[in-house]
């Protein structure tokens, strides 16, 4: 059995947003999930998040905003060059300049917009719009 914590987080956020919840608890907490939530917060897809400390790694309490139309995980985790990001942008996002693709780069986890500004590529993780 393969377990994908990122997929669990994205699906939990998507499902909670669709039924109109304002807050959701996500666990277990990890540094990668925290950085992905930070990118989503920077682009106002979530209002805020905080870590709830527990003995088994902790959880995140995420306050949702009403701006998420859809989100999902990109599998397989494709490596892309900076020049090819636009191709995946048109594949996963409904329109240009609408939504973000989250990727991991040598400079950390960021949106495709930041990666293009820095001129770097990376591995695609998820999309949100």
Curated annotation (Swiss-Prot):
CC terms in the record's Gene Ontology section: ribonucleoprotein complex; ribosome
InterPro entries: Ribosomal_uS8 (IPR000630), Ribosomal_uS8_CS (IPR047863), Ribosomal_uS8_sf (IPR035987)
Pfam family name, one: Ribosomal_S8
GO biological process, one term: translation
GO molecular function, one term: structural constituent of ribosome
Key words of the record: Ribonucleoprotein, Ribosomal protein, RNA-binding, rRNA-binding
Function: One of the primary rRNA binding proteins, it binds directly to 16S rRNA central domain where it helps coordinate assembly of the platform of the 30S subunit.
NCBIfam families noted in UniProt: PRK04034.1 (NF003115)
Subunit structure of this chain's protein: Part of the 30S ribosomal subunit.
Family of the protein in this entry: Belongs to the universal ribosomal protein uS8 family.
PANTHER family, A to Z: 40S RIBOSOMAL PROTEIN S15A
Name under which the protein is recorded: Small ribosomal subunit protein uS8
Organism: Picrophilus torridus (strain ATCC 700027 / DSM 9790 / JCM 10055 / NBRC 100828 / KAW 2/3)
Gene designation: rps8
């Amino acid at each position: 059995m393969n377990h994908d914590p990122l997929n669990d987080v994205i699906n939990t956020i998507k499902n909670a947003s669709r039924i109109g919840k304002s807050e959701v608890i996500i666990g277990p907490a990890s540094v990668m999930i925290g950085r992905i939530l930070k990118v989503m917060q920077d682009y106002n897809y979530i209002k805020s998040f905080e870590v709830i400390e527990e003995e088994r790694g902790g959880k995140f309490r995420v306050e949702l905003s009403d701006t998420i139309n859809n989100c999902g995980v990109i599998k397989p985790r494709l490596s892309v060059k900076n020049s090819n990001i636009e191709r995946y942008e048109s594949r996963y996002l409904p329109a240009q300049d609408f939504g973000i693709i989250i990727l991991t780069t040598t400079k950390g986890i960021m949106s495709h917009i930041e990666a293009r500004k820095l001129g770097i590529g990376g591995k695609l993780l998820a999309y949100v719009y």
